[in-house]
């Protein structure tokens, strides 16, 4: 089984069977919190654990996109990106789920994609026509699916708990 994780707040988790068939596609669980300035969203960490826990102990290979700072990105934005990535890695470690990190340029190049999110969505729709990717904003779902597909196609065999590539 391969699980693809696009780790942003408005992203997704895709679960593929050992044959590469889509088993589940989940939006990242988030909480909306009230603040003195309005509201903000953050990761629902217990929700992340509940989402991944059923796959613990199975022959599972998790592929997570490696988050990195981008040129011109603000300090707060960089912090949020790293914080979210760290939460995901912490959840995977706590659940003892083996994982591989991959930079966006690596997996996208391997699948013949560029930086365009719409191209990723269209490619995912070709590979998985049953997936609900109709909206342009479903690029996070599409990228999670493609990360899982990349793992299934390129990295092959599952790993054992505690192993990391």
What are these regions (language model features)?
Residues 1-165:
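Phosphate- and other anionic-substrate recognition elements at nucleic-acid/protein interfaces
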